Amino acid sequence: MKNITLFLLASVIFTACTTPFESFGEFSRKQLQNSEHNSWFMDNYDAHPLNETLVSQIDSLFSEIEVTIYMGTWCKDSQREVPGFFRIIDALDANDQINRLVGLNEDKISRDGSAEEAGITNVPTFIFSKKGEEINRIVEFPIISLEQDVLDILQDKGYKHAYDF
């Protein structure tokens, strides 16, 4: 009986001390990767065919850029594109330029109202900003490839995302 009581007490304490990952609201990449979402994250990170030629061109243009990412852990497009984007970010050594990573519910609503304020209609959405001003965004999927789309945005080549008509 004493052992059962100790076991139950230890279980309650352990459960109270662990915080489950909440994919609705703002979270870090580390929190995402250390959660139940790690398997699809790593599978798609490793599967992204990094175009090093384009990454080197992006590198010289990326220094003043900040990126806000709106995603849904429930969304296959987010599961595919967000890890691929982080593979590019890692190649650029630019993790500090990810301004926010925000998880939305299936209605594409954020906990803090920022998704509605930013006009998010599809996920993932990668918003590129310079000096606090949005310069462009990739919505749901790249037009050519993540690397090429990022480069086109940074080179101000009139990039239009899939829903910009």
Task: Locate predicted features.
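N-terminal leader/targeting and pre-domain segments
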Residues: 19-62
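Extracytoplasmic/periplasmic, Sec-exported soluble proteins
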Residues: 73-81, 118, 138, 142
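Loop/turn elements at helix/coil->beta-strand transitions in domains of secreted/extracellular proteins
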Residues: 63-66, 97, 131
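Thiol-based oxidoreductase modules, predominantly thioredoxin-like and allied folds used
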Residues: 69-73, 96-110
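Non-catalytic, surface beta->alpha helical segment in thiol-disulfide oxidoreductase systems
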Residues: 122, 127-165
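Local sequence-structure signature of Cys/Sec-based thiol-disulfide redox active-site neighborhoods
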Residues: 59-91
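Bacterial Sec-dependent N-terminal signal peptides
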Residues: 1-23
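Structural alpha/beta surface segment adjacent to cysteine/selenocysteine redox centers
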Residues: 111-122
